Curated annotation (Swiss-Prot):
Keyword annotations of the record: Electron transport, Heme, Iron, Membrane, Metal-binding, Photosynthesis, Photosystem II, Thylakoid, Transmembrane, Transmembrane helix, Transport
Pfam families: Cytochrom_B559 (PF00283)
NCBIfam families: cyt_b559_beta
Name of this chain's protein: Cytochrome b559 subunit beta
Function: This b-type cytochrome is tightly associated with the reaction center of photosystem II (PSII). PSII is a light-driven water:plastoquinone oxidoreductase that uses light energy to abstract electrons from H(2)O, generating O(2) and a proton gradient subsequently used for ATP formation. It consists of a core antenna complex that captures photons, and an electron transfer chain that converts photonic excitation into a charge separation.
Lineage, opening ranks: Bacteria, Bacillati, Cyanobacteriota, Cyanophyceae, Synechococcales
């Protein structure tokens, strides 16, 4: 049986904010949102 470190249920688990996963997600997500916004804005440019 795998033993797990037992926490008290009322004690919150500390999750670090800056992780490798967080950096990987945001380095992809931030430019993606920027480009989607730029492409959406281009649709309204009249020539």
């Amino acid at each position: 049986m795998a033993t797990k470190s037992v926490n008290k249920p009322d004690e919150p688990v500390f999750y670090p904010v800056f992780t490798v996963r967080w950096l990987a997600v945001h380095t992809l997500a931030i430019p993606t949102v920027f480009f989607l916004g730029a492409i959406a804005a281009m649709q309204f440019i009249q020539r």
